[in-house]
Design a protein with these regions (language model features):
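Bacterial N-terminal signal peptides
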Residues: 1-5
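Short, solvent-exposed loop/turn segments at conserved positions within beta-propeller repeat blades
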Residues: 49-50, 97-99, 177-181
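Surface-exposed loop/turn elements that mediate protein-protein interactions on large endomembrane-trafficking
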Residues: 53-66, 107-116, 189-193
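Terminal domain-start segments
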Residues: 11-80
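Acidic/hydrophobic-patterned starts of short beta strands in beta-sheet-rich repeat architectures
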Residues: 83-93, 154-162
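Short aromatic loop motif centered on NTY/YTY
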Residues: 115-191, 195-201
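Short, surface-exposed beta-strand/loop "edge" segments at domain boundaries and coil↔beta transitions
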Residues: 73-76, 97-101, 137, 168-173
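Mid-length scaffold segments of soluble, non-membrane domains
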Residues: 85-121
Length: 201
């Protein structure tokens, strides 16, 4: 697995410790480090956040943490490393159909990285049939595409992206052929950023 350490080089920080030390401003739905620590001590149990929603840990590994912050919001943390520096990839996902993720990167002191470490691939890379002009034009007509991101359960260096715009019943009924030709795209952490995995172009 990855060798994760604090930037200062003192000792390794676990994904759970970084979650507990997360600035309250980044997680207003659970703005209490004590509550966050209690949550990790009781895996599988449900806690109530200050707004009355139920919070629980969905999965935790050495390099990833996935939580449900309420009935419609999930949060994932992944630990990444490059050139003796360590990074946190934070994925916040609204699961309301069509689901949408927001991805941000931080150092281990929770300073946000300004350079883009993930760029959304071209829409046609999500198609199983890239020769179909009708499907490609349908994607273009959709305009803004909703998408979700998720880590490989055991390895945050692998990230899966999936278009969710056609999970909506109305969009699906209008263009059912598009949803049938969509597939996820995998990204790999390489040289300090996520790039397309293998030969997906």
């Amino acid at each position: 697995m990855l060798q994760i350490g604090v930037v200062s080089g003192t000792r390794a920080q676990s994904v759970g410790e970084l979650f507990v030390s997360m600035p309250d401003s980044l997680i207003p739905i659970l703005p209490d480090s004590t509550l966050r620590a209690d949550l990790l001590k009781s895996p599988g149990e449900t806690l109530t956040n200050p707004f009355g929603g139920e919070v629980k840990v969905l999965s935790e590994t050495e390099g990833t943490l996935r939580l449900a912050l309420d009935s419609s919001t999930e949060l994932e943390l992944g630990l990444l490393s490059y050139k003796k520096r360590n990074y946190i990839c934070l994925i916040a996902t609204s699961t309301i159909v069509p689901a949408q993720s927001v991805v941000a990167f931080y150092d281990t002191e929770w300073h946000r990285m300004q350079e883009p470490l993930l760029e959304m691939p071209d829409a046609e890379l999500f198609l199983t049939d890239r020769e179909s002009n009708g499907v490609k034009s349908g994607l273009a007509e959709q305009g803004h595409l909703h998408w979700v991101a998720s880590f490989n359960k055991d390895n945050p260096e692998l990230l899966t992206l999936r278009i969710t715009s056609y999970d909506d019943q109305t969009a699906h009924s209008l263009r059912p052929e598009i949803r049938e030709k969509l597939h996820p795209v995998q990204m790999r952490w390489k040289r300090g950023r996520y790039v397309l995995y293998n030969n997906q172009r």
